[in-house]
Amino acid sequence: MSFVVEPHIEEYAVAASTPHPLADLFERLAAETRERTTAPQMMVGPLEGRFLELLVRLTRARRVLELGTFTGWSSIAMASGLPPDGRIVTCDIDPEAQEIARRYAEEAGVADRIDYRLGPGLETIQSLEGPLDLVFIDADKEGYLDYYEATLPLLADDGLIVADNVLWSGRVAEDDPDERTRTIMAFNDHVRKDDRVVAVMLTVRDGMTLIRKR
């Protein structure tokens, strides 16, 4: 994944933000992810992780759904922003990545707020009842539209859907995008035209769209 924002600017933004109390743990998590996985760029990173935690706090979320656990940076960050009775359901199809996530969540002291599910995202969604306060979509890009349509009816009236990687390393702005990029573009276009919601796309890391019901 290429940065949409130049790396030195992202580094400045991280340095200018309040350090996370779990910063050392996240550094070790990142190191193990780079060592043990083939796609470490899938981690959210310090700036996006801090932003997700802030969103949880600002929305006063208690029920969070994450589609795409990977090695757990985002779920740990969001769990850090939950009240004691808050819970995150997070799902993934990679058992090795989720094992890493579980271990670091235990060390971070937030494992009791995270419900790990191993299996496809749609199956996880279908097992849940609303309302959900926050949904973070960060799984297979081909499934984004289905995840969006399946979670929107479960979303609380003042809830928030956050879709990650919506700028796809800037390739969404290219003249001749590849098939996967066109999939992301189709999702972005669908959300923009959806009269049920208000959406704002941000240039944080690889692009994030914040979606709220009208």
Language-model segments: residues:
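A short alpha-helical cap/connector motif
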Residues: 1-134, 141-162, 166-214
